[in-house]
């Protein structure tokens, strides 16, 4: 923990120093360069692994969060947010054997199901991920139990902790990869502007993130109210499920991706006979993930 906090202090000081230097000149350095690129002339094993991975898959492979030119990868960066309150500190993979096994997991269990439009720009493969949040000017452990997440899906990259994977058998890896794939697709689909996606969100656009009248405590009472508005899962707050609140767009998308990946149309029609909007949204999500290149 002391090592992590020391790293945080160093990073904070470096950011402040860089900000002060940036005020002297508005001319960006390396403005046209790609900080993810691998040097074509590099012949070390890691560079060859990363270069071959990109050649085969069209997405970059990272083993630390320092990019070319010294830029730090901000995995929590969100284009629509005014600020990012999340900080991620990584414990890196050390040997080329560990890195090769990590790359093999991505190629064997994730990428076969993700067409080019669904693939992250880069994968950051590390041993462990430590998550902190900024609150009231202080760095704190998250309240929701995500201090050591297994993975983090960001705009520029998806970070995966390999320590959770090394002890898994083939069946467990397949189940775990499904969870990862759902989160990767949720991140991409939630930012779509296609007609299919707009049709999907039109069912719930007046209710996303809205509280119901009155307090609902149980699934038995809350789920029919959610289903009546075309939702199949409620909002998740810091302390757990909130049946009195409708889901956000991202939560709705994630729930329907899960449904589309794991249920047939016949199963959905049987379960949600009384809720035609849910059946329609299922069909739209099935169409959407196929349009974007999900491979079963």
Question: Where do the model's predicted regions map?
Answer:
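Acidic/polar, low-complexity intrinsically disordered N-terminal segments immediately downstream
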Residues: 20-105, 113, 269-296
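C-terminal motif of bacterial Sec signal peptides marking the signal peptidase cleavage site
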Residues: 15-19
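Bacterial N-terminal signal peptides that target proteins for export
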Residues: 1-8
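Acidic/His-rich structured neighborhood in mature extracellular/periplasmic domains
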Residues: 90-215
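Repetitive helical segments and hydrophobic/amphipathic motifs
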Residues: 11-12
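A cross-kingdom marker for long, charged
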Residues: 236-296
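Acidic/His/Gly-enriched intrinsically disordered linker/tail segments
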Residues: 202-245
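Conserved aromatic-histidine-acidic binding/catalytic patches
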Residues: 90-98, 168-173, 220, 234, ...
